Amino acid sequence: SQLRWINLLLIPFSFLFLSCDLGKVELDNCQDLGNYTVDLPGIGFCPELSTGSVNDNIELSISVLDITDAAGVHAQVNYDASMVKIISADPGDFFLRSQKPIFVYEDDGQGKLDIYVFFMSSEKTNSGTGQIADIIVKLLQPGSSEVSITTESEILDPKDVKIPIKGFGTGTINAE
């Protein structure tokens, strides 16, 4: 009888303790608006703070935040060309549907990166929060530098009418 009580209590509690995984909390979930310091609707960086070593390549994502009926985005990014070099830019998943979105980027190598992404399918708009681009940058020298979304950035509806943007995000890149 006593053994039965031990089995009834010990086995379930063993599973409870063994199944609890207290792993790291993911603080850079790009879908969580709480991870951004940008007014909404807006465009921001995920993560807003990145750290790496000189000569490392690190990834930054550009996300649209709490937008409605977007058919396309032009995101202009200012960066310190003495501190980071743009290696590549690829489309995020926000405009990914049955067809891949049109995605073009232009880096002047002097500190300005323009990203254009828009629908070319029957699924004309998307709303919400999501990544529009994933950028790989190389850290050139030690120190801290800022990346920022400029006010030249635009979000457009299917008729090419600008959707108002309230927040233009900034990010910090630290190279050690």
What are the functions of these language-model segments?
Residues 1-3:
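N-terminal secretory signal peptides that target proteins for export/translocation
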Residues 7-17:
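Bacterial N-terminal signal peptides
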Residues 20-176:
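Acidic, low-complexity intrinsically disordered segments
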